[in-house]
Swiss-Prot record:
Pfam families: Ribosomal_L6
PANTHER family: 60S RIBOSOMAL PROTEIN L9, 60S/50S RIBOSOMAL PROTEIN L6/L9
Protein's UniProt name: Large ribosomal subunit protein uL6
Disulfide bonds: none
Entries under NCBIfam families matching the protein: PRK05518.1, uL6_arch
InterPro entries: Ribosomal_uL6-like (IPR000702), Ribosomal_uL6-like_a/b-dom_sf (IPR036789), Ribosomal_uL6_a/b-dom (IPR020040), Ribosomal_uL6_arc (IPR019907), Ribosomal_uL6_CS2 (IPR002359)
Keyword set, alphabetical order: Ribonucleoprotein, Ribosomal protein, RNA-binding, rRNA-binding
Keyword Metal-binding tagged: no
Provenance organism: Pyrococcus abyssi (strain GE5 / Orsay)
GO BP: cytoplasmic translation
Length: 184
């Protein structure tokens, strides 16, 4: 059963940003680069009209309204990415064995984690830069999902299973997302 006759969400396009829609693909170009994403849901129309991105659906059901607002959030994140970018900060924590972290190509190499001989590896997604400064790792990029996934890959590479986490707290942890500290 439809909720309303239609749902329409509008996003203002800021100065210096270009948005183009071709079929189901939304492209956002800005000062930091270009992000492209495919957004498809049956009956949902996305178009640019008078300096605004419009997301529209006729006779929406509850799920359709949720999808329209999700698409709005995705496009807002794309616009924020090409204007400001996204930054995650991770901290290297160890008590006994000093962990060495270095970037090699599209991988982060973690050596001497808990005294292990074999290095652990974490994948860096395309379009993301990783910098290591002492005990801090900075992950930056314009695609929010790629930056978040790269930070998660690094954090998961040092995950400890079958040991008491209250005692063995060594690892690499996300401590800041988009300038906001993460509390544990």
């Amino acid at each position: 059963m439809p909720v309303d006759a239609w749902v329409r969400e509008e996003i203002e396009i800021p100065e210096g940003v270009e948005v183009s829609v071709q079929g189901n693909t939304v492209k956002v170009k800005g000062p930091k680069g270009e992000v492209e994403r495919e957004l498809f849901w049956p009956g949902v129309k996305i178009f640019v009209e008078g300096g605004k991105v419009v997301i529209y659906k006729d006779f929406p059901r509850r799920k359709d309204v949720a999808i329209v607002r999700t698409f709005k959030a995705h496009i807002n994140n794309m616009i924020k990415g090409v204007t400001e970018g996204f930054t995650y900060k991770l901290k290297v924590v160890y008590s006994h064995f000093p962990i060495t972290v270095k970037v090699q190509g599209d991988e982060v190499i973690i050596e001497n984690f808990l005294g292990e001989k074999a290095p652990r590896r974490a994948k860096i997604l395309p379009g993301v830069t990783v910098k290591v400064k002492g005990q801090e790792i900075i992950v930056e990029g314009i695609d929010k999902e790629a930056v978040g996934q790269t930070a998660a890959n690094i954090e998961q590479a040092t995950r400890i299973t079958k040991w008491d986490r209250r005692v063995f707290q060594d690892g690499i942890y996300i401590v800041e997302k988009a300038g906001k500290p993460i509390t544990f």
